[in-house]
UniProtKB/Swiss-Prot annotation:
<keyword id="KW-0934">Plastid</keyword>
<keyword id="KW-0150">Chloroplast</keyword>
<dbReference type="InterPro" id="IPR040278">
    <property type="entry name" value="UPF0426"/>
</dbReference>
<keyword id="KW-0809">Transit peptide</keyword>
<comment type="similarity">
    <text>Belongs to the UPF0426 family.</text>
</comment>
<feature type="compositionally biased region" description="Acidic residues">
    <location>
        <begin position="100"/>
        <end position="123"/>
    </location>
</feature>
<protein>
    <recommendedName>
        <fullName>UPF0426 protein At1g28150, chloroplastic</fullName>
    </recommendedName>
</protein>
<dbReference type="GO" id="GO:0010287">
    <property type="term" value="C:plastoglobule"/>
</dbReference>
<feature type="region of interest" description="Disordered">
    <location>
        <begin position="97"/>
        <end position="123"/>
    </location>
</feature>
<feature type="transit peptide" description="Chloroplast">
    <location>
        <begin position="1"/>
        <end position="26"/>
    </location>
</feature>
Length: 123
């Protein structure tokens, strides 16, 4: 019995090798090309391709998961958040989370006139 682990990381980041019951599963790699020869019942993985703190979308989604999933659901169904039933739900969700406009302003999410698109004239 063995395990096959597929990693989408760059090849220079490490090699994943599995060895169980005296059989070596190298996924087409010759045994002399393997970097590691683990002991019995060992699975080694050297690198990680996913780092949650560096993913701002996921870190924000984990703060308010129900609001995030509701927004995703509304976006997938192309619902208008300004219509009455959804507008009430969004208002209640924002009030329940305790987020104020001042906190949003302090985070720098406010759009300034300098950052907004400017109108240009082409002759």
């Amino acid at each position: 019995m063995g395990f096959v682990l597929i990693c989408t990381c760059p090849p220079s980041s490490g090699v994943v090798v599995s060895q169980l019951h005296h059989h070596q599963f190298s996924a087409g790699v010759k045994s002399n090309e393997l970097w590691f020869r683990p002991t019995r019942r060992t699975l080694i993985s050297k690198s990680s391709c996913f780092n949650l703190p560096q993913e701002p979308i996921l870190s924000e989604a984990l703060k308010e998961p129900i609001a995030f999933l509701g927004g995703m659901f509304a976006g997938l169904l192309r619902l208008d958040l300004n219509e009455e039933p959804l507008k009430d739900w969004v208002t209640r969700t924002v009030e329940a989370s305790g987020i104020t406009e001042e906190e949003v302003d302090a985070d720098g999410v406010v759009s300034n006139d300098e950052d907004s698109p400017q109108q240009i004239e082409i002759e």
